[in-house]
Amino acid sequence: MSRSETITALKQYFKVKELVCPHTYQRYGENAWQFLSTCYLETLLIIREQIIAAPMYCNTSNLNQRGLRCNLCPIVSNKQSLYLSAHILGKAGDFTVRGLTAEEARNKIIQNAHLLPYPIRMEKNVTWLHIDTLPQHNIVEKVYLF
């Protein structure tokens, strides 16, 4: 599937406004898809359609730094030292899944890791589902919990 086809398929489930910070959306609108990694988008589509198969929410009216973060986002701009994350690289999102706890969603993904097109990282012991496709040096697991 091409990048364009992946984005078209994802639009059934997500608006780009949900996947990027408000600053990015205000500046770039629908063109903000350009800042999201193709590997991340392909992985998100598989997780949403084939693994979770339920509504997933990233940015909402109350939570707006859960997807792509730019240099103006408080989580980034308040840092006093070097800050690099999959979120600022367009390779991560923090999600709430309708009908599942974060732990249940993580377990579903782990059980279906063979469906994932790329290795992923998931944050453990948090109340949200963090998914990213940031490559890890010397990590061979398809799903790496950190």
Predicted regions and their residues:
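Compositionally biased, intrinsically disordered/low-complexity regions enriched for serine, proline
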Residues: 19, 52, 71, 114-116
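A short linear-motif detector with a strong N-terminal bias
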Residues: 35-37, 69-76, 108-112
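Active-site acidic/histidine clusters and adjacent loop/turn architecture
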Residues: 1-57
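Catalytic cores and adjacent binding grooves of peptidoglycan-active enzymes
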Residues: 83-146
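Extended, low-complexity, intrinsically disordered C-terminal regulatory tails
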Residues: 41-80
